[in-house]
Swiss-Prot record:
InterPro entries from the UniProt entry: Acetyltransferase_Enz (IPR052777), Acyl_CoA_acyltransferase (IPR016181), GNAT_dom (IPR000182)
The protein's enzyme class: transferase
Name by which UniProt lists this protein: Uncharacterized N-acetyltransferase C1271.07c
Keyword match Cytoplasm: yes
Keywords: Acyltransferase, Cytoplasm, Nucleus, Transferase
Domain of life: Eukaryota
EC number annotated for this UniProt entry: 2.3.1.-
Length: 163
């Protein structure tokens, strides 16, 4: 089993990084079988930099020592000044159990603070118990819906970050 010390997490900068991010998001969509057309996911995949790119957003990819993409996460501005939304946290099934989710969430929060955000929102499904527990371990609390999501059993969460 890989050790976290053999894992690197970096911002998407190169074309290969972007291709890997898109591939991971496509795997995420296939695994969970959700219809996210209401989120314009096709446009998002066609040009992720438009939604998640600098200067106000960021995409991160976790890799092993061989450069294989293992997971991803992104953030973009959402809902007013100082607020961002975490999206597309995904770890490949064969890489689960390595605490990659913890590492990715920690990194995206740190990057978001550097970008000047003071709060972060996200939505997940109540059936994804490991994800809900992970978010709560970072201080996320359930909150009122911040947009309309037609998928049943959605949990909306918010984190007030240190300034």
């Amino acid at each position: 089993m890989m050790k976290p010390s053999n894992i690197s997490i970096s911002a998407v900068k190169l074309p290969q990084d972007l291709d890997d991010f898109k591939m991971l998001v496509q795997e995420y969509l296939q695994e969970f079988g959700m219809d996210l057309t209401f989120q314009n996911v096709d446009d998002e995949l066609a040009n992720p930099m438009r939604k998640y790119g600098p200067p106000h957003g960021i995409m991160l990819v976790a890799r092993d020592e061989h450069g294989t993409a293992l997971g991803c996460v992104a953030v973009h501005p959402f809902g007013g000044p100082g607020c961002c939304e975490m999206k597309r946290l995904y770890v490949r099934p064969e890489s689960r159990g390595l605490k990659l989710g913890v590492l990715l969430v920690k990194e995206i929060i740190q990057y978001s603070e550097k970008l000047g955000y003071s709060s972060m929102v996200l939505d997940t499904l109540d059936t994804l118990l490991p994800a809900v527990r992970l978010y709560k371990s970072f201080g996320f609390k359930t909150t009122e819906p911040y947009y309309h999501n037609p998928i049943p059993n959605v949990v909306y969460m918010r984190l007030e970050m240190s300034k």
